[in-house]
């Protein structure tokens, strides 16, 4: 039981850290003009596609690590549930508390933290992320069982 709980906790932390590192690195390398639509803080199509790819890869890794630590059982399923429930809760909070578009004009490059705080995504993107994440965890958990 302790291994399962530890697997879920470590898996979630790994997922979070990998996503922060990936998004900050990609934004730093690609810049604001690639990440956002022209003169706005609305995420570009390229950023949205990359975002889903990062979510899938990092959650597969998290599911794999969770399953490896738990050594069997339903820990990856629990982690997938945590990713889905927390992700959807944050999505609901985000859409309820933040306007979809502030019509703020972005001028050139902006620092990473400003980009994160001002970025806007369509609602479907915000709600699809946790679903992709939960699926990734389940895939990673199954990979460990096969290996």
Task: Locate each region found by the language model.
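Juxtamembrane/disordered regions of integral membrane proteins
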Residues: 1-147
């Amino acid at each position: 039981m302790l291994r399962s709980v530890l697997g879920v906790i470590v898996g979630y932390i790994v997922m979070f850290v990998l996503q922060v590192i990936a998004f900050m690195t990609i934004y730093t390398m690609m810049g604001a003009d690639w990440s956002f639509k022209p003169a706005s803080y609305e995420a570009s199509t390229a950023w949205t596609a990359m975002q889903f790819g990062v979510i899938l890869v990092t959650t597969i890794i998290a599911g794999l690590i969770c399953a490896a630590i738990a050594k069997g059982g339903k820990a990856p399923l629990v982690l997938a549930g945590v990713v889905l429930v927390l992700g959807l809760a944050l999505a609901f909070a985000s859409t309820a508390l933040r306007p979809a578009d502030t019509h703020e004009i972005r001028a050139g490059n902006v620092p990473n933290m400003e980009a994160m705080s001002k970025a806007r995504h369509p609602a479907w993107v915000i709600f699809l992320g946790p679903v992709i994440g939960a699926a990734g965890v389940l895939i990673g958990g199954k990979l460990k069982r096969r290996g």
